[in-house]
Regions:
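Charged, often Cys/His-bearing segments associated with DNA-binding zinc-finger transcription factors
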Residues: 1-36, 180-184, 357-369
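Hydrophobic, well-ordered secondary-structure elements that form the walls
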Residues: 65, 80, 104, 221, ...
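Short acidic (Asp/Glu) and glycine-rich catalytic loops that position anionic groups and cofactors
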Residues: 8-13, 41-45, 106-108, 196-198, ...
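Short helix-capping/linker segments at secondary-structure and domain boundaries
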Residues: 72-79, 229, 329-333, 352-365
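Secondary-structure capping and boundary motifs in well-ordered enzyme cores
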Residues: 22, 26, 53-61, 76, ...
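Polybasic low-complexity intrinsically disordered regions
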Residues: 85, 94-276, 280, 289, ...
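Helix-centered, glycine/charged polyanion-binding patches within enzymatic domains
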Residues: 166-169, 176, 181-183, 266-339, ...
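Basic, low-complexity intrinsically disordered segments
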Residues: 2-5, 11, 15, 27-137, ...
Length: 369
């Protein structure tokens, strides 16, 4: 018998969002881990807010929503609010009831700034790493470091001389006065003399010889070699020396004082970096750069089987950067300023680790999260 296409919808539903989400949905495991971490962060949240006044967006829901935005590659917070309004799965993950009103995007952004000031993303990331360590998913001896550029949320047209008081006037007859045509040919531009009027902390940099120069930030990842989890992250100005500075800083921040190995590509093969890494009790398993010069490491390092393993494992760090670009929405930045960019990059790394924990725990016999 053919069913009727009834257009009259019922006013009430007796099923909760919890009952609608499949028991084996990947977000369930991620939600469990996230809830445990947020419960541990409760005291930090309490210190961030006054005891009196109008209630804000609960920081737990705010952070869940931001994690969801990363996991589902939602391009903007406005689109996130739109999807929270009608997406049942998203409402369940964030903790919104079916009839609960979604926040205004401006209010959401203002509340996020409070989390930024308290460096909540860094604490959240640290607790995610702690969860992975509790499941014995991370090595504390073998690591890989790498860095790359992130294209800033600013165009080259905004890169102007620092002493230029007035905005560049559009040419007469320009068909688009709001986005005037600018000719850069013959103009010498550098970070010493020019600055972006859109994002003053973004610097002009290129990934390599012959590559296009773009306004960028420099992002860095310290990966443990057992399962490719992110052990630490850092974002610095793209000044040309940021890769080595960030690598040494992250190694110095590792807990304990036991010797470790540190895999890296040819960009880290310098006498100064190798010497400073060894001072930090890190054996530099860097790829040798013998082009036009002598490598900073020799057979005393490369002859060991561990060196070859490090060189094989270090390539996995590209999976992290790839995930952050395609899923995490970090191919081109949506935020401005070093602090906010670093905050979002740290939260994206935490989201990546959450996915890895869920996948690895599922693959382990009798694994649990």
């Amino acid at each position: 018998m053919r069913g009727e296409d009834v257009q009259q919808h019922t006013m009430y539903s007796y099923l909760s969002p919890e009952e609608r989400v499949p028991a084996n949905h990947p977000l369930r495991a991620i939600r469990q881990i996230t809830d445990r971490i947020l419960k541990e962060m409760s005291r930090l949240f309490a210190r961030m807010y006054a005891r009196r006044g109008r209630p804000s967006i609960p920081p737990e829901k705010l952070l869940r929503a931001l994690v969801l935005q990363i996991l589902y590659t939602i391009r903007s917070e406005r689109m996130l609010m739109e999807q929270l309004n009608y997406n049942l799965l998203f409402r369940w993950f964030v903790g919104l009831n079916m009839d609960e009103e979604v926040w205004d995007v401006t209010v959401f952004t203002k509340n996020r700034e409070r989390l930024l000031k308290a460096d909540v993303a860094r604490r959240f990331f640290q607790l995610v790493v702690k969860e992975a360590e509790a499941l014995d998913l991370m090595s504390d001896e073998h690591f890989t470091v790498d860095g790359t550029l992130m294209e800033a949320c600013a165009s080259l047209k905004s890169f102007k001389k620092m002493d230029q008081a007035e905005e560049q006037k559009p040419k007469s007859g320009d068909d688009d006065p709001g986005n005037p045509t600018v000719d850069f040919h013959g103009e010498e531009r550098s970070n010493k003399t020019h600055q972006s009027t859109t994002d003053a902390e973004a610097l002009l940099a290129r990934k390599g010889a012959g590559k296009e120069a773009k306004l960028s930030y420099s992002r860095h990842v310290l990966m443990e070699n057992r399962n490719g989890m992110v052990a630490d992250v850092d974002v610095l100005p793209a000044n040309g020396t940021a890769e080595r500075e960030a690598a040494l800083g992250m190694v110095a921040s590792l807990p304990g004082d036991q010797p470790v190995t540190l895999g890296a590509d040819k960009n880290y093969d310098s006498k100064q970096f190798v010497a400073e890494a060894r001072e930090l009790k890190a054996t530099p398993h860097v790829a040798q750069n013998n082009k036009r010069r002598k490598s900073a490491i020799d057979g005393r390092t490369t002859r060991h089987p561990g060196y070859k393993i490090s060189q094989q494992k270090r390539k996995r760090v590209e999976e992290i950067f790839g995930w952050m670009k395609t899923v995490g929405g970090m191919r081109k930045l949506r935020h401005r300023g070093l602090q906010l960019v670093g905050w979002m990059f740290t939260l994206t790394a935490a989201a990546y680790n959450l996915v890895r924990i869920r996948n690895l725990a599922t693959a382990i016999p009798h694994g649990h999260v």
